Design a protein with these regions (language model features):
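A long, amphipathic alpha-helix that forms part
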Residues: 144-170
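Active-site environment of divalent metal-dependent phosphoester hydrolases
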Residues: 12-16, 45-49, 65-68, 93, ...
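Metal-dependent phosphoester-hydrolase catalytic domains
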Residues: 84-85, 160-172, 178-240
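N-terminal, active-site-proximal structural segment of metallo-dependent hydrolase catalytic domains
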Residues: 1-52, 158
Length: 240
């Protein structure tokens, strides 16, 4: 059987107007039009749930210990087990949730992941895309120091997620915003022997982060029992 899986960091549905004139209904309509069988979304407020999408089953998890943001796994198929991955019993700074989903007579486990953000400022992104020779030393130090701290956080999160995945009784599909590149430790640790849907059936460079063109930080990975036939990244700007 064929199932359609969609992963999207909706950036709290543009609640603070980062993208001028973009209304949350536009994002809803896009998700509704895509009509995925399994939808994983990151970064949204609970009040902005999307019941009009008519997904019968969902799992909503709080995104971090302190954050008011949440993430969710919506599906057209029954979810029989839902939980949050923890580190030594504690929630991560960011979150990984999972649902066990019955599709016909088979059960799969779907993980939705959002690893630690780099917390770059707009000035950091500007420097990355437009390096200033006169200020390059200070700017590089600022960017590198942030990356060192969050790189370590993502590594710890990735280790916990991989440990949890190793004990899954079902074949897995992993969706999410890793905030890191395919060369990173976090990506490689989580991926393990899974296949990458972009690598298997995508085209182009697969960039997924508007602020740094050509950067891929969002992924759909899957067990080798599955096959990716049509990876697609829409060229729309409804989030970052």
């Amino acid at each position: 059987d064929t199932i359609k899986v969609l992963s999207y960091n909706v950036r709290i549905f543009n609640a603070y107007g980062w993208i001028p004139q973009l209304k949350k209904e536009t994002i809803y309509n896009y998700l509704k039009k895509e009509n995925a069988d399994i939808l994983c979304i990151q970064e949204f407020y609970v009040k902005d749930e999307i019941p009009e999408m008519n997904y019968k089953y969902h799992h909503i998890g709080k995104q971090s210990k302190k954050s008011k943001w949440h993430m969710a796994i919506y599906s057209k198929y029954k979810q029989i087990n839902k939980a949050t991955v923890t580190i030594n019993g504690e929630k991560m700074n960011n979150t990984c949730i999972f649902s066990d989903i019955i599709i016909n007579n088979d059960t799969i486990r779907v993980y939705n992941i959002h690893l630690a953000s780099n917390w770059f400022k707009e000035s950091d992104y500007y420097f990355i895309n437009n390096p200033n020779k006169e200020k390059i030393y200070n700017n590089i130090n600022a960017v590198v120091n942030k990356m060192k701290k969050t790189y370590k956080s993502r590594a710890i999160e990735a280790l916990a997620i991989r440990k949890h995945m190793n004990n899954s009784p079902y074949p897995v599909i992993v969706c999410g915003d890793f905030n890191d590149t395919p060369m990173s430790y976090a990506y490689k640790k989580i991926k393990g022997n899974l296949d990458d849907s972009f690598s298997k059936s995508g085209q182009g460079i697969g960039s997924s982060f508007v602020k740094i063109p050509a950067l891929r930080i969002d992924y759909i990975l899957y067990d080798k029992k599955f096959k990716s036939t049509n990876y697609k990244k829409d060229n729309i700007i409804l989030s970052d």
